[in-house]
C-alpha cells in the first residue's frame, strides 16, 4: 500500500493533478484497515461484499457486527414430482459439457424452479432451508430436492437462497431476475 501512495505522489508531481482519491482495494483489505496498518492516504475501499453479504472475503467467515441474511434470491416452484434419484437409462454430458454424477437416495420429491444458469450459477446459491438440496440447473430451470423441506411445498411455493457475491452479481444484472 505504501508503494501505491508513492505512485500517487509521483503522478501528482508529473501531472500537477491533486489525485486526492486512492482506491486501495476491496473487502479483503478491511482487516488491514481495522488493524490501523493501512496508510492513511488510502481513502477508498470497495467493500460491497462485506457490507451487503456480511462476509470476510479472505475466508468467507461472518464479518463482525454484520448480518449474513440481508440478501435472498427467491424463485418459485413450477413443477413438483416424486422421482427416482438415479435417472433411467444412459446419461451423458449436460448442455454445459459436464458429466453429472448421481447418488442413489431412492425416490425423492424434486422441484423445478423458474431460475436457471442464464441467471445464476447454481453453485452460487445456498438454500435458506437446510432440507433443500440444489441438484443442478438447465439454462432456464433450477432443480431442487425438496424431500427434507422444513415446510410443505407445492407448485407456486417460493424457494429462498443466499447468494455468494458472484451469485448476487449475476442475479442483480440479469434482465430475467427482478
Describe every region a protein language model picked out:
Residues 1-71:
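Active-site loop/helix belt of alpha/beta enzymes
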Residues 84-178:
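C-terminal accessory subdomain/extension
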Residues 71-73, 109:
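Hydrophobic core residues within well-ordered beta-strands of beta-rich domains
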Amino acid at each position: 500500500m505504501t508503494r501505491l501512495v508513492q505512485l500517487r505522489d509521483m503522478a501528482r508531481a508529473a501531472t500537477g493533478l491533486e489525485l486526492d482519491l486512492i482506491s486501495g482495494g476491496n473487502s479483503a483489505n478491511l482487516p488491514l484497515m481495522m488493524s490501523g496498518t493501512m496508510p492513511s492516504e488510502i481513502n477508498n475501499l470497495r467493500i460491497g461484499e462485506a457490507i451487503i453479504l456480511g462476509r470476510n472475503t479472505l475466508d468467507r467467515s461472518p464479518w463482525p457486527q454484520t448480518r449474513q441474511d440481508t440478501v435472498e434470491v427467491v424463485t418459485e416452484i413450477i413443477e413438483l414430482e416424486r422421482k427416482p434419484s438415479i435417472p433411467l437409462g444412459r446419461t451423458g454430458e449436460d448442455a454445459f459439457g459436464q458429466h453429472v454424477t448421481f447418488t442413489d437416495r431412492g425416490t425423492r420429491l424434486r422441484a423445478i424452479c423458474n431460475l436457471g444458469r442464464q441467471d445464476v450459477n447454481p453453485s452460487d446459491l445456498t438454500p435458506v432451508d437446510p432440507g433443500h438440496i440444489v441438484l443442478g440447473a438447465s439454462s432456464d430451470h433450477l432443480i431442487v430436492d425438496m424431500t427434507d423441506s422444513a415446510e410443505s411445498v407445492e407448485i407456486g411455493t417460493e424457494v429462498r437462497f443466499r447468494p455468494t457475491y458472484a451469485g448476487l452479481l449475476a442475479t442483480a444484472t440479469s434482465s430475467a431476475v427482478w
